[in-house]
Amino acid sequence: MNKYDLVKIIENFAPLELQEKWDCSGWIVETSQIDVKRVMIALTVDEKIFKQALNKNCDMIISHHPLFSIPLAFRGIDIYCAHTNMDKVLGGTTDTFIEALGLNGSPEGEFLRIVEKNISVKELSQKIKKVSPNARLINNNGIQNVSKIAFCAGSGMDLYNEAIENKCDCFVTGDIKYHNAVDAQIVMFDVGHFESEILIKKVFYGLIKDKIEVVIADENSPFKTI
């Protein structure tokens, strides 16, 4: 398949103009080949993923996280990424995580999604644990029930104040730092950067599976519970 036609499918879903100014979504490595036969879908491209792609005879990688520096060895295969544009678009990264919990969210701003549902912290914890087994709960005030939950997949603590302004009593995101946890006045869940975003591979797959042969990269969180 023509690789530019393939990318057009992704960009029709998550337009590049949605990406943040600092982001580098789009073509990370663009070779001279026009047609591709097999594509690998990954959350993050690193040396292991690149070797997987080579071993699986993939001639292109589509990823969520971009590479900010390109090892010379990576330049022999097309690499395309959809990062913050995929985070913002409806049906993207955060929406996919919320859907996996069996919940429905509404957009608030560009990145935040809000779920309005009366639910106990215990029940919400159980839902989250099924998707993110190593998630951590922060509940400094012993709150038993919540009714307005803000979500941001990946690293979302810069949206904490926005969640508070929207009168949310719970915030679900990843990469929560210690002092953020100590200062938290609402319920928070650190669900992990990897765990909250890995499901985006299903979105990529759904977009292109009928157009080309797809291989799903074998990826694991770099963090291990000891």
What is each residue range found by the language model?
Residues 1-226:
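Active-site catalytic microenvironments in core metabolic enzymes, especially phosphate/sugar-handling
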